[in-house]
């Protein structure tokens, strides 16, 4: 699933979604929607069927929306990492850049955000 392009609808239903640190291994730097099943995926119980029905409806909703294309004008785009203690400064920098015609895309500076930023730059997004 991670090899599918950014913006392509992806849903992963997992009973392990709430295990600390494990979801990072599933998602890594992709835009996968992680849907916690709460109940174990073993036999089609009424509760599991409800979870799978809702996951299917979520996917159907995503498929009804317009396909998102990367920005046509990437020449004026700037990727910027942001972190809570520096948010005020980052916001001021973002506003100044936007006033000068740049499109600023913010990424969280910890965890997978920095790697996601590098990956998206490599993909030309």
Regions found by a protein language model. Give the residues of each.
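Short, acidic/small-residue loops that bind anionic groups at enzyme active sites
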Residues: 2-27, 33-41, 103-109
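Solvent-exposed alpha-helices and their adjacent loops that cap or buttress functional pockets
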Residues: 3-6, 25-28, 68-75, 96, ...
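Short, low-complexity, polar/charged sequence segments that are solvent-exposed and flexible
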Residues: 7-8, 30-33, 52-56, 97-100, ...
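Cap/lid and interdomain-hinge subdomains that line or gate substrate/regulatory clefts
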Residues: 21-85
